[in-house]
Curated annotation (Swiss-Prot):
Any matching Pfam family: Otopetrin
Function: Proton-selective channel gated by extracellular protons.
Residue ranges, Cytoplasmic side: 1-112, 167-182, 241-248, 335-358, 416-507, 564-614, 675-681
Region called Disordered, residue ranges: 1-26
Entry coiled-coil feature ranges: none
Family of the protein in this entry: Belongs to the otopetrin family.
Gene encoding the protein: otop3
InterPro entries, A to Z: Otopetrin
Protein name: Proton channel OTOP3
Regulation: pH regulates the proton channel activity from both sides of the plasma membrane. Low pH activates the channel from the extracellular side but inactivates the channel on the intracellular side. Zn(2+) and Ca(2+) can partially block the channel.
Species classification: Eukaryota, Metazoa, Chordata, Craniata, Vertebrata
Length: 681
């Protein structure tokens, strides 16, 4: 009986030999040394199997052969991960644990717990400091929060350089998670990072041109932010796929420090952006002395200082998105620290193509052009301070026009996914039936060839017995496969030596999608209540009510479509592409002629796939337009006055300042996921 300290592969080999001794009376090694090859259960081996001596021994031999294959896979690909010389994680709390792999798992969980608590407390502390500047009526000076953030950015930059220059250069220090760090995410990281650096440059120029204001701390803060953004962008571009196997504690705490810094910078940018939106209200409620003090640090509208201010105000949405993207990538890196799972091979690369996709890009492009025209026209009037009723009607009318088709497209995409799943199930059953008949024919032909080569005469009655026996043998094989499918064949569906390959990126995407959707849903429900209570109803009230209701339906339907699409992608990734490729390679020319058209026409873009691609492309373009409407310039929710009359300026502005940043992130995050859906469909 083996002890638990032995590696998993050796235990599996021992169980394999024990099973063979109990049921066959012979070891698996002896079974493999026979001249008679044991047939495999895989359908790709049709045409290569030989009849066994007895159905029961056939099933036993098959299971023995499969276990041997799994042992080879485990030994060749994954045994090196748990070898004694490798870097297993240790923890002082679990020092009495004598099993290395168990100690590694417990130490990993303990490291996640303490580093997570460290990051959480740091976020709460920094969030209190940053928000106190805006809520304490200048009792907490802004330079205190800037000094705190400067310390965090410097420490994070030092850790990032240490990770890039020291940890990653050691042998065996890094494995890779191929699910993390999608190309569209890295491209967004680079673009938004450049925009954040430009924002800091504009802030420095704006601070230098101000007079009678304290500018030294502002210059220091934005200079350090430029260094931090540059180092962090390089770190995440290079290391976003890393599964670090050395210096686990330093890496976890460094990642949490950097992640907390990004969250606090995001909160600072959200507060600054909200204060720019609320500036007129703050000035109207302030005293004369406060207004004079605020006017001393304002730029004339016709100066270069005013132009730089408009520049960094325009860059706020990019900086907000940059901080959130960095936080998501860092969270995946933190989850992957100490992870000792490896894929069999790299996942397939998907290229962006518009072949056969016409209506989605065409209609979406038209909606984008019209939306930009409406947006520019509204912002011109909002900048002048006088927004006409016609501009409100055009703004809300345009949103209603695009929201209704987005709802229809989301529902159509969900239906297309269900039809596609049904079609794939039918093709799988058809292919299995055809392969079964091919197997029966091959078994019969092999029996006849064997009889003729041995010179033995077979009567018609003997042929019927052989065919009946072959059918019985095949029925036993088929029942065994169905039983394994129902109970779950753990040796086949696990991609790693420690279990099923986890995809932390996809789980995080779904979580962020749900959390960010709460912002717009809350705003919409508050708007609906305010519109219903306010009397009498006007055209603007009706448009606001309809727009809020359509937004709720659109968020719910699009979220369901995205989740259903990601589930479909996950189901496709669970299938073994190498197994199917091997099966197709083993098909002879005669079998290809006998195969149904559905098996040979796999590259054809079916109706359900085309519908999913069309819907994903249209929704992606419309979400880009909705992101532009919510992220840039003035927003009608600040200016129409319906909700402000019911809730008051302070409460309504607080609702908007919390909900709108989440809504903006939802749109941008949806664009990335919809692009992934389009590529995988």
């Amino acid at each position: 009986m083996l002890s638990k300290e032995e590696p998993a592969c050796r235990q599996f080999h021992s169980r394999e030999k024990t099973w063979g001794n109990e049921h066959n009376g012979k070891t698996v090694t002896q079974a493999n040394n026979k001249e008679h090859k044991v047939p495999a259960v895989r359908r790709g081996d049709i045409g290569q199997r030989e009849p066994a001596a007895h159905p029961a021994s056939h099933i036993q031999g098959t299971m023995a052969s499969e276990n041997t294959g799994e042992q080879a896979t485990c030994k060749d690909q994954y045994m090196d991960l748990d070898a004694p010389g490798n870097n297993l994680e240790h923890s002082w709390l679990h020092r009495h644990c004598e099993i290395p792999t168990t100690l590694h798992q417990r130490a990993k969980k303990t490291g996640r717990l303490f580093s997570g608590l460290f990051g959480l407390n740091l976020m709460f502390l920094g969030g209190t400091v940053v928000s106190s500047v805006a809520l304490s009526n200048k009792a907490v000076p802004e330079r205190d929060s800037q000094s705190f953030l400067c310390i965090l950015m410097l420490l994070s930059s030092v850790w990032a350089l240490y990770h890039l220059l020291f940890i990653r250069n050691q042998n065996g220090a890094v494995h890779h998670d191929h699910h993390a760090g999608a190309m569209w995410l890295k491209a967004s990281l680079a673009i938004f990072g450049v925009c954040s650096i430009i924002l800091s440059i504009f802030e420095i120029g704006h601070a230098l041109l101000l007079q009678n204001c304290e500018i030294l701390m502002d210059i220091v803060f934005f200079s350090i932010e430029i260094v931090f953004v540059s180092v962090q962008t390089v770190l995440l571009w290079v290391s976003c796929k890393d599964c670090v196997q050395m210096h686990h504690s330093v890496t976890r705490y460094g990642i949490m420090l950097t992640l907390a810094t990004d969250i606090l910078l995001w909160l600072t940018a959200v507060i600054d952006d909200s204060l720019e939106q609320d500036l007129e209200i703050l000035q109207s409620n302030s005293t004369q002395d406060e207004s004079n003090e605020m006017a001393q640090c304002q730029c004339p509208t016709d100066s270069m200082c005013w132009g730089l201010k408009q520049g960094y105000v325009t860059m706020f949405p990019f900086n907000i998105e940059y901080s959130l993207i960095c936080a998501t990538l860092l969270f995946i890196m933190w989850k992957n620290v100490g992870r000792r799972e490896k894929l069999h091979s790299d996942p397939p690369r998907h290229t962006f193509q518009l072949r056969g996709i016409i209506y989605g890009p065409l209609i979406g492009g038209a909606a984008l052009l019209v939306g930009i025209s409406v947006f520019v026209q509204y912002q011109v009037e909002a900048t002048s301070g006088m927004v006409s009723i016609l501009s409100y009607h055009m703004y809300y009318g345009y949103k209603m026009i695009i929201l209704a088709p987005m709802i229809v497209c989301s529902v159509a995409g969900i239906i297309a996914h269900s039809l596609r799943e049904k079609e794939k199930k039918g093709q799988k059953e058809t292919g299995r039936s055809d392969q079964d008949w091919l197997h029966m024919e091959d078994v019969g032909s092999e029996n006849k060839n064997t009889d003729y080569s041995s010179g033995q005469y077979q009567s018609s009655q003997g042929d019927e017995k052989i065919q009946g026996y072959s059918l019985a043998q095949f029925a036993l094989d088929n029942e065994k496969e169905k039983l394994e499918h129902r109970q779950g064949n753990t040796t086949k569906k696990h991609n790693t030596h420690q279990g099923k390959m986890k995809n932390y990126t996809r789980k995080l995407d779904v979580t962020l999608l749900f959390v960010s959707a709460v912002g717009q849903l809350g705003i919409s429900y508050f708007s609906i209540i305010a519109t219903v209570v306010t009397t009498p109803w006007t055209m603007l009230s009706a448009l606001n009510f309809s727009n809020s209701l359509l937004l709720i339906l659109q968020y719910l339907s699009q979220t369901m479509f995205i989740i259903e699409s990601m589930r479909s992608i996950h189901e496709e990734e669970k299938e073994k592409p190498g197994h199917h490729e091997e099966s197709h390679r083993r098909m002879s020319v005669q079998e290809m002629h006998k195969a149904p058209p559905s098996c040979l026409d796999a590259g054809h873009l079916g109706l359900s796939r085309r519908v999913v691609k069309e819907m994903a492309m249209f929704l992606m373009i419309c979400n880009i337009m909705c992101w532009i409407l919510g992220a840039f310039g003035a927003h009608p929710l600040y200016m129409n006055g319906l909700e402000r009359q019911l809730y008051g300026s302070g409460i309504w502005l607080a609702i908007l300042n919390i909900g709108l940043p989440l809504s903006v992130f939802y749109r941008m995050h949806s664009v990335g996921i919809l692009l992934e859906v389009y590529l995988h469909a």
